[in-house]
Swiss-Prot record:
It comes from the Bacteria. One of its GO terms (cellular component) is proton-transporting ATP synthase complex. This is ATP synthase subunit delta. GO terms for molecular function: proton-transporting ATP synthase activity, rotational mechanism. Belongs to the ATPase delta chain family. HAMAP family: ATP_synth_delta_bact. It holds the Pfam family OSCP. Signal peptide: none annotated. PANTHER family: ATP SYNTHASE DELTA CHAIN. F-type ATPases have 2 components, F(1) - the catalytic core - and F(0) - the membrane proton channel. F(1) has five subunits: alpha(3), beta(3), gamma(1), delta(1), epsilon(1). F(0) has three main subunits: a(1), b(2) and c(10-14). The alpha and beta chains form an alternating ring which encloses part of the gamma chain. F(1) is attached to F(0) by a central stalk formed by the gamma and epsilon chains, while a peripheral stalk is formed by the delta and b chains. Coiled coil: none annotated. Keywords: ATP synthesis, Cell inner membrane, Cell membrane, CF(1), Hydrogen ion transport, Ion transport, Membrane, Transport.
Length: 179
């Protein structure tokens, strides 16, 4: 899903959920979906695959929403996304929705990718450091990406800080090719 499309879907869902008093429930549902997609690459692949019909993807999402007891607005949004060929992009929609909900609460969201899981103490220290830098309350969302090899990538709004070992090695590789 393009950032623009994810923004449109997420904004529409957020406004509807907020007007229905279900913004937090939908946010929790979408966070659960993101976790499912991360934990089950097979699910993510099935939703993104052009080999599966729209109806199959809609059925998968409907069953998932029912089993997880998701809010009806979340389930309906899954159906709309599937019918419009966007089932594979629900992770992006969930990410944008979370940012909208956090902004509505006056909290800035920091997406942090690390090679290994951060401890609670490390996450709290990072949040405090980011709060000091941005002057606002920070909500840290972490994602483990072993391919980074070490270090971390922090994305806050349109700003990104990449201190991963992978990017440093890629930079060295490029410099060596140019030499």
């Amino acid at each position: 899903m393009t950032a623009e499309a994810a923004g449109r879907y997420a904004t529409a869902l957020f406004e509807l959920a907020k007007s229905e008093g279900a913004a937090e429930a939908v946010e929790a549902d979408l966070a659960a979906l993101r976790a499912m997609l991360t934990e089950s690459p097979e699910l993510a692949d099935a939703l993104a695959s052009p080999l599966h019909a729209v109806e199959v993807k809609a059925g998968i999402l409907s069953a998932l929403a029912k089993k997880a007891k998701f809010n009806v607005l979340t389930a309906n949004a899954f159906g709309v996304a599937a019918r419009n060929g966007r089932a594979g992009d629900l992770g992006d929609l969930a990410r944008v929705y979370a940012a909208l909900a956090a902004a509505d609460r006056g909290v800035v969201t920091a997406d942090v990718q690390t090679a290994a899981a951060l401890t609670k103490k490390q996450t709290e220290a990072l949040a405090a450091s980011l709060k000091s830098a941005f002057g606002r309350e920070i909500e840290v969302r972490t994602e483990v990406r072993p391919e980074l090899m070490g270090g971390l990538i922090v994305k806050v709004g349109s700003r990104m800080f990449d201190s991963s070992l992978r990017s440093k090695l890629d930079g060295m590789k490029t410099a060596m090719k140019e030499a």
